[in-house]
Swiss-Prot record:
Protein name per its UniProtKB record: Uracil-DNA glycosylase
A cellular component term, taken from the record's GO annotations: cytoplasm
Active site residues of this protein: 73 (proton acceptor)
Subcellular location: Cytoplasm
CDD domains on file: UDG-F1-like (cd10027)
Encoding gene (name): ung
Length: 241
């Protein structure tokens, strides 16, 4: 699959390529490649674009991971998904779950909400913004579940667990919390709460203090904290011009 992905313009950062090479050689990844090709051949629009399937890994090398935030699958609206969970491209309306994440950041750390939903600055500091499923068909939520991506991203989580020390896993909602099974909590910190969705945020996401707890854990182990304050303006955000 790696060669096929390379032909599609996909990037995979070297440290990840090293630990995930066995996944790319596996039969399930070949089947996943065939599935995606068939979907595109049938004229279906797939999000994000091929070059951004592995954007979370590209922006956050394995040896730089400090925090892992797990999502389920990409946004399925036009122009939203770009390979980072919860994040949307510049100029796109901030989704409700991310609005609630911003509210908790303000309550927890006094972080000023911004008017965009572009989270790349977190990724570049070591926050792995990983969806469990890395593609989706336009307007069909969860349409690519069960095609192999889950096995791949489970391998990503296992790699972080095995290769890194003192990482914080923020597991929001029951789906993400299942991934705690791959994490050695003797060396990593797992924080659980309800999902930031408007359907569940008031049941314990608000007030969870996860962002301050994550930074306190990092500092206690000699790691630099995350600057959760996003830049006010990002390139390409027409809403802010």
């Amino acid at each position: 699959m790696e060669a096929g992905m390379a032909e599609a313009g996909v990037k995979l950062e070297d440290s990840w390529k090293h630990v995930l090479s066995g996944e790319f050689a596996s039969p399930y990844m070949q089947k996943l490649k065939e599935f995606l090709l068939a979907e595109k051949t049938a004229g279906k629009r797939i999000f994000p674009k091929g070059a951004e399937y592995f954007r979370a890994l590209d922006l956050t090398p394995l040896d730089e991971v400090k925090v892992v935030i797990l999502g389920q699958d990409p946004y399925h609206g036009l122009g939203q998904a770009h390979g980072l969970c919860f994040s949307v491209q510049p100029g796109v309306r901030i989704p409700p779950s991310l609005v609630n994440i911003y509210k908790e950041l303000q309550s927890d750390l006094g972080i000023r909400p911004v008017k965009h939903g572009f989270l790349e600055s977190w990724a570049k500091q070591g926050v792995l913004l990983l969806n469990s499923v890395l593609t989706v068909e336009e307007a069909r939520a969860a349409s690519h579940q069960g095609q192999g991506w889950e096995k791949f991203t489970d391998a990503v989580i296992r790699a972080v667990n095995d290769e890194c020390d003192h990482v914080v896993f923020l597991l929001w909602g029951s789906y993400a919390q299942k991934k705690a099974a791959f994490v050695d909590q003797r060396k990593h910190l797992v924080l659980r709460s309800p999902h930031p969705s408007p359907l569940s945020a008031h049941n314990g996401f608000f007030g969870n203090g996860h962002f301050s707890k994550a930074n306190a854990f990092l500092v206690s182990h000699g790691r630099d904290p995350i600057d959760w304050q996003l830049p006010d303006v990002v390139e390409g955000d027409k809403n802010l011009l």
